[in-house]
Amino acid sequence: MLSRREVLMMAPLSAAALRQSTRSRAGAAQPSTPVTFEVPAGACDCHTHVFGDPGRFPFTPNRTYTPESASVDEMRALHRALHTTRVVIVQPSVYGTDNACTVDAIKQLGPGARGIAVIDDQTPDTKLDEMDRDGIRGIRINLATAGQTDPELGRRRFDAAVTRIGRRKWHVQMYTQLSVIEAMQKQIAASPVPVVFDHFGGAQAAGGPTQRGFDVLLDLVRSGRAYVKVSAPYRGSTAAPDFADMGPLAKALIAANVRRILWGTDWPHPDTTPGRASTEISPLRQIDDGRVLNQFGSWASPSERKSILVDNPRELYGF
């Protein structure tokens, strides 16, 4: 959850300028490899984003990157190819606390869609109630995209998010590093609401299951105190295009507690790598999600796949 001070400078970007800069975009990737296992009915992609028309949904000027657009229709094509019928749309950092694009996408997709919002300390409870009716099921704390590694910042945002959730059937979703999770272990273990970690909890393939902090992540999963998304394996891998080197991490998480594992694509795969000006268009990564889903299938048995793809999302997001 962002503080009011952090979003005070937010203002719409010139839509005309942004449209001019996105005319020759590569486009959001679509799977080129067929899925080779039987995807269970009701399977859910638990981590996606939508980047809409900048004239209608302007980016915040203090973002760290500027993505190409990725539409609801393109997302529908993705999920037809993957044989997934449910989806969770996660509010990306480029929109700050303006969740309009995310909520609009949920409404377009209907009852098979849920969402995760970003809020600040000025977001009124009436707005949270409205978003709850619209399908929002959690609050995202994104520390990683801006390179924030201070555990104290994580603690403050976590406490604020839990307080705002109140009695709603929501959870806290965190995108951060293992070092922050390790420092926040006691706080997370005592949380009155579910906690979800994005993208393998920030674990890196090169470190393997013995890397510092991964044991803490496993303990939180094992005890049922946290969920982990085995999503966006390319963020921790050096073995494109299948990202097989993330297998030991995925298998360790599944073995710890299959009922606390989720799967997601991270489509349309925004490239948040530092080095560009924040207003320069960052081309979407061309990830073959068919290959990625097949790789996940090699890490889990059919019964484990059903838990991860169907049962766990149904319970957490209320499908």
For every predicted segment, state its role.
Residues 1-14:
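N-terminal secretory signal peptides and thylakoid transit peptides that target proteins
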Residues 8, 27-97:
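An N-terminally biased module of ancient metal coordination in phosphate/nucleic-acid-related enzymes
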Residues 15-30:
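Bacterial Sec-dependent signal peptides at the C-terminal "C-region" and cleavage site
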Residues 26-34, 210-319:
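H/E-rich (His + Asp/Glu) clusters that bind or coordinate divalent metals
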Residues 44-48, 87-90, 115-117, 139-141, ...:
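Hydrophobic faces of well-ordered beta-strands that scaffold small-molecule active sites
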Residues 51-73, 77-85, 134-146, 193, ...:
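Active-site gating loops and adjacent loop-to-helix segments of metal-dependent hydrolytic enzymes
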Residues 71-74, 123-126, 181-182, 209-217:
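Alpha-helical scaffolding within the catalytic cores
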Residues 94-179, 186-189, 222, 227-241:
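Active-site gating/metal-coordination segments in enzymes
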